[in-house]
Amino acid sequence: MVKKSKVGSTGRFGARYGRKAKRTVKDIEDKMHAKHVCPKCDRPGVKRTHAGIWKCRKCGAVFTGGAYIPTTPMGKVAKRNIKRITGGE
């Protein structure tokens, strides 16, 4: 029995581009296509429409975020600082 390879979405590249590059692409695409929670309605259903633009399928909210994930580490820091300055609303 042949051992099955777990190439995922990078199987489309075939033997090209090398193992490390394909692994990086697979990790990014897995994070991008995962279930993301909407910051407005707190429901999972956020989809990426363009690079950095995300839309909730439930409430229709459109917001910006990272290119591959809706919230970036710097965005989390900024949100925390704003909450601290305004009094934690």
Swiss-Prot record:
Residues 1-28 are annotated as: Disordered. Its cofactor is Zn(2+). GO terms for cellular component: ribonucleoprotein complex; ribosome. The keyword Manganese does not apply. Binds 1 zinc ion per subunit. It holds the Pfam family Ribosomal_L37ae. GO terms for biological process: translation. Gene3D superfamilies: 2.20.25.30. A zinc finger (C4-type) spans 38-59. It comes from the Archaea. Keywords: Metal-binding, Ribonucleoprotein, Ribosomal protein, RNA-binding, Zinc, Zinc-finger. GO terms for molecular function: large ribosomal subunit rRNA binding; structural constituent of ribosome; zinc ion binding. PANTHER family: 60S RIBOSOMAL PROTEIN L37A (PTHR48129), LARGE RIBOSOMAL SUBUNIT PROTEIN EL43 (PTHR48129:SF1). HAMAP family: Ribosomal_eL43 (MF_00327). Belongs to the eukaryotic ribosomal protein eL43 family. This is Large ribosomal subunit protein eL43. The gene is rpl37ae.
